[in-house]
Amino acid sequence: MPQLNTTVWPTIITSMLLTLFLLMQLKTLNMYYHPPASPKLMNIKPHNNPWEHKWTKIYSLHSLPLQS
């Protein structure tokens, strides 16, 4: 039975690893990697909400008295 002959195993394993390594190199070299995106400056306008100016601590839920 030839599979029990272990004298050729290192040669087969080495050739298999070398072949897989070369195939992976060829596969990854054919891929196109996009360059990283450059940051874009955006003009952000502050939102004017009508409740921002009149919201005070009096209306906050944590400052209201406890109700039983």
Swiss-Prot record:
Kindly list the positions at which N6-succinyllysine occurs in this protein.
Answer: K54
The name of this protein is ATP synthase F(0) complex subunit 8
Q: InterPro entries per the record? A: ATP8_mammal, ATP8_metazoa
State if Electron transport is listed as a keyword.
no
Highest taxon of the lineage: Eukaryota
A GO molecular function term, named singly, is: proton transmembrane transporter activity
Q: Which residues carry this modification: N6-acetyllysine?
A: K54, K57
Write out the annotated subcellular location. Answer: Mitochondrion membrane
User: What is known about what this protein does?
Assistant: Subunit 8, of the mitochondrial membrane ATP synthase complex (F(1)F(0) ATP synthase or Complex V) that produces ATP from ADP in the presence of a proton gradient across the membrane which is generated by electron transport complexes of the respiratory chain. ATP synthase complex consist of a soluble F(1) head domain - the catalytic core - and a membrane F(1) domain - the membrane proton channel. These two domains are linked by a central stalk rotating inside the F(1) region and a stationary peripheral stalk.
Gene label = MT-ATP8
The family assignment reads: Belongs to the ATPase protein 8 family.
Keywords assigned: Acetylation, ATP synthesis, CF(0), Hydrogen ion transport, Ion transport, Membrane, Mitochondrion, Transmembrane, Transmembrane helix, Transport
Subunit structure of this chain's protein: Component of the ATP synthase complex composed at least of ATP5F1A/subunit alpha, ATP5F1B/subunit beta, ATP5MC1/subunit c (homooctomer), MT-ATP6/subunit a, MT-ATP8/subunit 8, ATP5ME/subunit e, ATP5MF/subunit f, ATP5MG/subunit g, ATP5MK/subunit k, ATP5MJ/subunit j, ATP5F1C/subunit gamma, ATP5F1D/subunit delta, ATP5F1E/subunit epsilon, ATP5PF/subunit F6, ATP5PB/subunit b, ATP5PD/subunit d, ATP5PO/subunit OSCP.
Q: How does it sit in the membrane?
A: Single-pass membrane protein
Which Gene Ontology BP terms does the record give? proton motive force-driven ATP synthesis
